[in-house]
Amino acid sequence: MYKRQGWVYDPEGIDVAALKEIKEVKRARLTEYKNYRPNSEYHEGRGVWNVKVDIALPCATQNELHLEDAKALVANGCIAVCEGANMPTTLEATEYLQENGVIFAPGKAANAGGVATSALEMSQNSERLSWTFEEVDAKLKNIMVNICHNMVDAAERYGFKGNYVVGANIAGFEKVVDAMTAQGIV
């Protein structure tokens, strides 16, 4: 768990309930996490990408994961990086991760849930419907699965199997072309 001031490493996994208590109820600093989980460690600064992990989830700001960070992730055996923000990984870091066999899910696909949920909300409102949380969640899961399938399929069809950046770009472009064609623009 990473914030601008520092980060927490919990070998037993992040305790989401404790984190919510600290940040949402107490409005305290991340340093308080240690009081809830004695085996956890708090570190000042940016070193979060130096921890041995299987999966890294850069979800904060643009360009937060740099080439040096990507090298540390690869050296520590990271197998996948999934962006949860708008371009949190620099181009150099993305290329390095891909060149070293790390599965890389770009934010334009992996982070599409927020935009998709907004579209669902607009649809619901325009039709004067009231969906339950479960209904919205099911619709969102379906959208995200379709995005993933389209990304993987596009990468494979164009000879870039496993390159999800290319797959997401092509799949997105195809959607725009289909919409423009349907509107008679092309």
What is the predicted function of each stretch?
Residues L57-C59, G84:
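Short, well-ordered coil/turn residues at beta-beta hairpins
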Residues A60-E68, P88-L91:
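Beta-loop-alpha module in the N-terminal Rossmann-like domain of NAD(P)-dependent dehydrogenases
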Residues H43-V53, N63-A80:
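Rossmann-fold NAD(P) dinucleotide-binding segment
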Residues M1-K52:
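Glycine-rich phosphate/diphosphate-binding loop of Rossmann-like nucleotide-binding domains
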Residues A72-V186:
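Adenosine-phosphate binding glycine-rich loop
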Residues Q5-W7, E12-K20, T31, N63, ...:
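Flexible, active-site-adjacent loop/turn segments at secondary-structure boundaries
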